[in-house]
């Protein structure tokens, strides 16, 4: 993952008399080493953690000071309950923390708290709140699939020859050690009725960069996809399709291939910033993030007016949605189709990098808490899209077709043939 460097800082410190001040913390990495013995101490500490380390305070509408005033007394009641009966049901703790953080906009966030004194019949002794699990089902185009989404699209692609003429269809699974996950790939070279070709790529995660470095089966498949784009004569190349439906995210370096392969010069694609200090609004400056022309693959699809269609849906998350957003923002022939995406656009760093700044994942559930939250705030096309997601150029909803994946792909081919 690329390192992002800033050269200046913006400092804004805000305090109020309606709640206890967030104590200065030397760096947020220390937060994982603190201890507490009561529910109020636990709450007080976690409130300070998010006051310091949450990166979206400039756009999140949660009134964090009012939340302290409202919920601190409720945690005092839990302490009294423990003193009276010797335990606190985990469901009661979950209800309070869901009300506290459930409406936050960070769609990467996972907020876990251990119940210090669970009831004897509690099945678990901790609660986990993920704001996106509460927000996503409220969208009017939400479609509840009967199975895991990435499997659904793989089954669909395995039967693609029954819908379209296919000249090449390669699929494989490769392991990306940097992600600690396996990635499933499908490369298809479609043939249109007029004989022209459309290279297509679907991957379950954004892992082109680490897989290319390994030079295994995944790298071979990816090379075939990019070679088809680079080497097919213009009169035979109808367009390009990148399918990011059900793509759960991964490496931002993949943009070096997915955008850089089509650039002639260094290009800014977004800006990022992070929490530089303990103050709630103590950010670094917005730092441009540039993509350079790819030295391995290159074709000027803008000059040749080659359509570049990117499919995305509600299950396009993190890099899975940043890719269609930035491709559309940078490349004039790009066109996006599908659904408004998940809304988790804040880049992340591993927990072992947390001491480099004041935001991101921290803690250990075995010692009381674990908070997984975005390290960086991203601004694309002048806007922070966290908790909102990206709305594509052309809306085609799976819900309108009982979950069928084909109409979105049909729309991609229709656009390519019309342009």
Name every feature range the model reports, one short phrase each:
Residues 1-25:
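Bacterial Sec-dependent N-terminal signal peptides
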Residues 17-270, 355-357:
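Flexible, low-complexity junctional segments that flank or bridge functional domains
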Residues 199-203, 239-243, 269-271, 307-312, ...:
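Structural recognition of the beta-strand scaffold that forms the well-ordered cores
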Residues 205-209, 246-252, 268-269, 276-278, ...:
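Solvent-exposed loop/turn segments at secondary-structure junctions
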Residues 249-307, 349, 355, 368, ...:
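Gly/Ser/Thr-rich loop/hinge elements
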Residues 320-332:
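Non-catalytic, well-ordered alpha-helical segments in soluble enzyme domains
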Residues 331-344:
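Short, well-structured beta-strand/strand-turn elements
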Residues 381-419:
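Low-complexity, Gly/Ser/Thr/Pro-rich intrinsically disordered linker/tail segments
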């Amino acid at each position: 993952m690329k390192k992002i460097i800033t050269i200046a800082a913006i400092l804004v410190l805000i305090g109020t008399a309606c709640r206890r001040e967030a104590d200065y913390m030397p760096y947020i990495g220390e937060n994982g080493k603190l201890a507490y013995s009561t529910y109020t101490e636990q709450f007080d500490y976690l409130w300070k953690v998010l006051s310091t380390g949450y990166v979206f305070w400039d756009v999140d509408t949660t009134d964090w000071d009012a939340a302290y005033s409202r919920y601190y007394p409720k945690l005092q009641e839990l302490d009294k309950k423990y003193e009276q009966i010797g335990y606190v049901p985990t469901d009661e703790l979950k209800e309070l923390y869901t009300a506290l953080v459930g409406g936050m906009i960070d769609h990467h966030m996972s907020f876990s708290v251990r119940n210090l004194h669970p009831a004897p019949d509690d099945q678990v002794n901790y609660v986990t709140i993920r704001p996106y699990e509460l927000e996503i089902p409220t969208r009017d185009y939400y479609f509840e699939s009967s199975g895991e989404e990435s499997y659904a699209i793989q089954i669909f692609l395995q039967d693609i020859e029954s819908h379209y003429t296919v000249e090449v269809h390669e699929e494989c699974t490769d392991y990306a050690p940097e992600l600690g996950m396996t990635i499933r790939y499908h490369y298809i070279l479609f043939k249109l009725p007029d004989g022209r070709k459309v290279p297509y790529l679907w991957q379950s995660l954004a892992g082109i960069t680490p897989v290319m470095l390994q030079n295994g089966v995944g790298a071979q498949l990816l090379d075939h996809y990019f070679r088809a784009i680079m080497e097919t004569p213009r009169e035979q190349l109808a367009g390009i399709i990148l399918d990011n439906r059900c793509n759960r995210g991964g490496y931002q370096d993949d943009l070096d291939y997915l955008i850089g392969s089509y650039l002639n010069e260094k290009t800014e694609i977004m800006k990022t910033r992070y929490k530089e200090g303990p103050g709630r609004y103590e950010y670094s400056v917005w730092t441009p993030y540039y993509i350079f022309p790819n030295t391995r693959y290159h074709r000027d699809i803008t000059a040749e007016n080659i359509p570049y269609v990117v499919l995305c849906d509600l299950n396009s998350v993190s890099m899975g949605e940043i890719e269609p957003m930035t491709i559309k923002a940078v490349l004039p022939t790009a066109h996006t189709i599908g659904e408004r995406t998940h809304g988790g656009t804040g880049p992340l760093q591993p927990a072992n990098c947390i001491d480099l700044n004041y935001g991101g994942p921290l803690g250990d559930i075995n010692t009381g808490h674990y908070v997984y939250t975005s390290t960086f705030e991203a601004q694309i096309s002048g806007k922070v899209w966290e908790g909102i997601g990206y709305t594509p150029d052309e809306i085609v909803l799976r819900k309108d077709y009982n979950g069928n994946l084909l109409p979105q792909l049909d729309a991609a081919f229709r656009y390519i043939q019309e342009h």
